[in-house]
Amino acid sequence: MRYSLFLEFFFVFVLTCSLDVICYKRTSSLNLVTDIKQIKNKSIHKRNRLYSSNENLKRLKYIREVTNASIQVCNDALKECNNDVDKAIELVRKNTKNGSFISTSVKTQKEGLICSDIMDDKIVLIELLTDSDFVARNNKFVTFLKNISKLCLHNEIIPPNIDVNDSVENFDTSLVAIDKIMQSPYTNSNGEINGTVSEELNYLRNIFREDIKIGRFSKYIKKNENEFLHYYIHNIVDGNNVGLSGVMLVIEIDNLNEKLKTKEKDIISFANDLCMHIISAKPVSVSIDKVNQNVVKKEMDIIRDSLKDLNKPENIITNMINGKMKKFYSNVVLLEQEYMLDDTKRKVSQVIKDFSKNNDLTINVKHFDNFIVGEKNILV
């Protein structure tokens, strides 16, 4: 009897201990799962917060680069404008005594190359972008860029209903052109057609695992026999037409064919100098009348708002606006800029006049496009 009672108590004790162990394990497992979920949630939250923080820093850097205002001022403007960068720039400039641009060109997080080609009465300038310098310098990338540059030169890329000589500043024209390029048959270096440009581009993307794409594109066709076409590539990477930045320039010279017989070297040298100035000074238009009128109106509104607290008569305010607009034009208009290749402090327009007079030429700048990899102009 005692022995059986002892066994019964022992069995109950063992069963109770087993249940306690099982419950403990289950509780521990549940706690562990909960802890893991909390860690994951914290990690995701931290990553999202870090991403948001990085994006905000990029916006602040962009605004500061354009306005040269303090980080605090830029941050306050960004918050007030609900993270709208363009509106924040306007707000900073309106609230600043000196509302002029510090720079119209800002950095972008992209690598790539520029290529230009010229043939008889046509010239093209094209930009190919990717994520890393390593890929941009790869022979496959360079070859692809050169091949599509030739394709653009020989084929009708821009539809007949659009002015082929529209500047790249016309964003719709550039988009239409790039879409047409992507659909065009791709001819390799051996003259063989291998699918379309789009298919070849996807092939390169799969090889390099990077976001390779056509950035900007511009093409110009001569309007008359007096137009002289020229390109200049800076920081050359391959041959003489592929590099990190490039300018496509069109100048009109009276009796061009006759003048080229005796002045060709001088004309080419002068065109090169103008291109180097354009790369350095980064103008957005040839002359004042060719500046986008929306940009002009926006600029005048910003200047007027920045002067609203001065309590001056309207005629004085108008004179001040005109003075600031003159300074604005001297920063962004080619012919109004101070020539950067010497220390004479002459305007580009005066440099052209002096060269024309010294060489018995009549020169007018008709058109230019300026592409710099990793930079974009906020007025374009």
From Swiss-Prot:
GO biological process assignments: mitochondrial translational elongation
CDD domains: UBA_TAP-C_like
InterPro entries for this protein: EF-Ts_dimer_sf, Transl_elong_EFTs/EF1B, Transl_elong_EFTs/EF1B_dimer, UBA-like_sf
Subcellular location: Mitochondrion
GO MF annotation terms: translation elongation factor activity
Domain of life of the source: Eukaryota
Broad class of where this protein is predominantly found: mitochondrion
Any GO CC annotation of this UniProt entry: mitochondrion
Keyword terms of this UniProt record: Elongation factor, Mitochondrion, Protein biosynthesis
Gene3D superfamilies associated with the record: 1.10.286.20, DNA helicase RuvA subunit, C-terminal domain (1.10.8.10), Elongation factor Ts, dimerisation domain (3.30.479.20)
One Pfam family named in its UniProt record: EF_TS
Described function: Associates with the EF-Tu.GDP complex and induces the exchange of GDP to GTP. It remains bound to the aminoacyl-tRNA.EF-Tu.GTP complex up to the GTP hydrolysis stage on the ribosome.
Other comment: This protein may be expected to contain an N-terminal transit peptide but none has been predicted.
Family, per entry: Belongs to the EF-Ts family.
Protein name: Elongation factor Ts, mitochondrial
Organism: Plasmodium chabaudi chabaudi
Species classification: Eukaryota, Sar, Alveolata, Apicomplexa, Aconoidasida
